[in-house]
Amino acid sequence: MNTAPLDKIYRAIDTIKSAAGGAKFAGIHVEGPYIDKEKRGCHTESFIREPHFDEISQIIERIAPLHAHFTIAPEHDDKGEGVINKIVRSGGSVGIGHTGADAETVRRALADGAVSFTHTFNAMSEFRHREPGASGMALATAAFAEFICDGIHLAPETVEAAYNAKLRFGDKFVLITDSIPSAGLPDGDYDMNGIPFTLFRGKACTSAGTIVGSALDIPTAILNLMKFCDIPLEKALLCATKAPAEMAGIYDREGSLDIGKSADIVICDERLGIQKVIVSGIMVYERNN
């Protein structure tokens, strides 16, 4: 969910929880408003605010029983509250993102319990040879790191370098879409939270050239990762199944086909075109050829 006033965040949570249909939501990611204004991307600046646990705890309660995941800019978790640690102890999880934090601040956030980096490299402090920033720490630590593999947010060579860097830590490379409501729609002019943008050939930008989000879907992200990194399907699939499930703390019941786990299965053709979807053992979608 994007940065918004608290009442709108509540409405979005309630809508998500009531509109699952055939889909199954593992949790809700509150990407704003606890981010850095300088690294806000297309989040509305006037709604950005400091993280206070009293407010965050109410959001966690509203999201329950789903898992609550928050993006936090850790340089703003220095008000004596220890918000990151409190979120983790309350059963939520934290990703580091939309941040200008230096490496030491990121290191402290990870020690406090942050588990991941939100859309790594995008809207975060850059890697430099004497100050690795959040981008460098995403590669140098065992935390999970999310990547938007659409060829727009990140160059293919950047994706390949990041994938190889994360290999030594196991399955910590997480494929995400960061898709916005215009994903899957024709090219044209759209609006998101009052921000006008144009979608053209898969790229969604404001008139100033700021990327609003992606038009990516997971099958395309998997195919792109295979191409960018020259890896087989079975390895790319781990980045869209096992890794995100482990990041969300639900790999004991989701993220792989195994005895005792949920019977959630997507059946695809050779180009990952979705043919059938099974949720909890029930067929909820079958393509009509």
Task: Give the residues covered by each predicted segment.
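Divalent-metal coordination cores built from histidine and acidic residues
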Residues: 1-66
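Short, electropositive alpha-helical surface patch
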Residues: 8-22, 81-93, 232-237, 253
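Generic structural signal for well-ordered alpha-helices
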Residues: 10-17, 56-57, 84, 106, ...
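Conserved, mostly hydrophobic/aromatic
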Residues: 30, 87, 117, 225, ...
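Active-site gating loops and adjacent loop-to-helix segments of metal-dependent hydrolytic enzymes
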Residues: 37-64, 108-120, 131-144, 186-216
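Active-site core of metal-dependent hydrolases
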Residues: 61-185
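His/Asp/Glu-enriched, well-ordered alpha-helical/loop segment
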Residues: 136-147, 164-177, 182-267
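C-terminal regulatory/interaction regions
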Residues: 253, 262-276, 280-288
